[in-house]
Structure formats: C-alpha cells, structure tokens
Amino acid sequence: MINMSSTLPTEPHRKAFIGSASNFWLHSSQTGFDLTHPSSPSESTLGRRITIQTTNTPITISPSKSALVIIDMQNFFLSSAFGRQKGAGHAACGQLIQHAIPAARKAGIRIIWLNWGLSAQDVQNMPPAVKRAFGFFAIPTSSDFTPGDAAFGDHPSSISVNKHGTPSSKASAYKGVGTDCGTLTLDDGTQVAAGKLLMADQWNSALYPPLDAIYTAGAQLPSTPDVWIHKDRMSGLWGGKTACEEFLQKEGITTLFFAGVNTDQCVGGTLTDAFSKGYDCVLLRDGCGTTSPACAQEAYEFNAAGTYGFCTSCAEFAKGVEEMKV
C-alpha cells in the first residue's frame, strides 16, 4: 500500500514584510503576524513578547507598545438608574474584570479608559447629527425660541423627544447632551444628582461602579498607570488629532485592543478611525457589547477579523499573557 501522505508536497515556509519602512508587520506562514514594530526590518523588538490566538491567525505583540482601550463603560450606558437592563454590556464588563484587565496589568499593557466627557464648548460646537443620537428637546409651535445662541439651550416648556423626534414613552429626565439628568434613584434606594448628560465630572459620565474601583486603583500604579481620556464624538480618534491620539503618540503605543460599549457605535467608530490612522486593531469580541441587534455585533467581529485587523476573546488575551515570552 502506498502511503499517500508521504507523496504530498510540503508547503514551504514563507515570510513577508507588510507596510512601509516606518510602519510594518512581519508575517510567517508558521507563526502568524508579528506586530511588535521593530525599528527596522533587519532588527528584532527587544523585551517581552506575547502571542495571542485570534479567530484567524496568531498575532505577536509587544506589551510596551500596546494598550487596552475600554470605551464608554459609564453610568449613563450601564446603570439601572437610567433603566439599563442587564445585557451584553454588563456581560462584557464581567469578561474584562475576570480576564482582560488582570492580564493587561500582569503584562504591563497600558489601560486607557476612553469616555464621553464634554465641556460647555464641546456641546456648543457639536454638530446636529451627533446631538440627535442622544435625543433632544422640542417646544410647542405656539412658543418662541429664545433669541440667539440661547435658542439651542433648554426651554421651560420643552419636552424630551427621541432621536426620531417622537416624545419619550415615559418621562425622561434629560433632553439631550449637556442637559440636566435630574435626580435618579439607585438600586439601594439612594438618590443621586446625575448631572448634565455626558459632560465631564458628572455622575452620569462616571465609570460604572465595578470598573470605577478598578480604574481608581489602576491610576495609582507606579508604572504604566491607567489613564482616563475624554472624547467628544462617538470616535475617540476622529479628525486631525484628539487627546487620545496625542497620548498614544507620546507613549509610542501602536497596538490597540478594543473593548466597551456600544460595539457598533463608539467602540467601532474608534476602531475604524484607528485602522485608518495606521494603528494595529484587535477587537475583544466578548469584551464589548451593544444594545443593537445581534447582526450589528457580528458585522463588527467579521470586519475586525477580516479587514480592520483581528478579533479575539478576553480569555485568549489572558492566555497569551500567561505564556508571555521575555
């Protein structure tokens, strides 16, 4: 009997450089993609290396050039005080706490908390399409708007309407970004002044409590402490340059692991802008969630793996760290 396996040709090992001299990956048909960004094609990156299995291929990263970017896991999006039911965002929170955050800490991977945190000037400059996404206020046609710029501020006779202009089905405490959310009741019966919607340093824009405690501890670390960066659009990397991009460039960070809410909005918007700006993009598929239909999550996972970069899980991220090479 002929052993057919012995007659099959062996695939040769292939290697490649992808990119340009200033920003490139290496690829090996045996070991996958190397995203460690050595200074030149003839050199190797010094220091620790982590290999992580993604949905399609292994990737190897440099912890010192990587960041875990956790987006918008704030009270407004997750707290039951705003009527948020337990869902995909809360499940993602659990995966981050159990796997991704401890792994990032162990590896010395920087954790960036990228959150809505508007100033009064941001609200004034915000275009209508972005404002509409969070609802707005409307007044009776028999009423008059306040003259000048004040017309864009809240009016005593106004009501809250959703992004389609339909009055809210139940009384809403806020009427769009920058408006007061009123007093809310927490699960334990405590009342809290929620502050102005998505503006910096308000209760509604604070991190969801389980994560807030983690950030507070991480911000005190002597080496690679956690950082909190405000954003003023769905994407934290939109336009010419944002505070997030300035930080990434200052720290020499090139590889970004994305998590948070909502996958198909702020997480996805930041990821696609990062892709266009030349960053290495990895979506932690169970470290992010959305209130949109399942197809929205699936589309971002599909495109992250096939076009924008790579897709993996929080557990695979942690497994890679456990097997980290020095």
Show the residue positions of the predicted features.
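Short hydrophobic beta-strand that contains or immediately precedes a catalytic carboxylate
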Residues: 69-71
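Active-site loop/turn elements of alpha/beta-hydrolase fold enzymes
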Residues: 73, 116, 286
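Charged, often glycine-rich, active-site loop that binds/positions anionic groups
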Residues: 125-137
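A short alpha/beta connector and helix-capping loop motif
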Residues: 64, 81-116
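Active-site-adjacent betaalpha module
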Residues: 2-67, 99-102, 106-107, 134-326
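Short acidic, Gly/Ser-rich segments with clustered Asp/Glu that frequently serve as metal-coordination loops
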Residues: 74-81
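Glycine-rich, phosphate-binding/catalytic loops in enzymes
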Residues: 85-89, 129-130, 275-276
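Short catalytic/ligand-binding loop motif for oxyanion handling, primarily in non-cytosolic enzymes
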Residues: 120-123
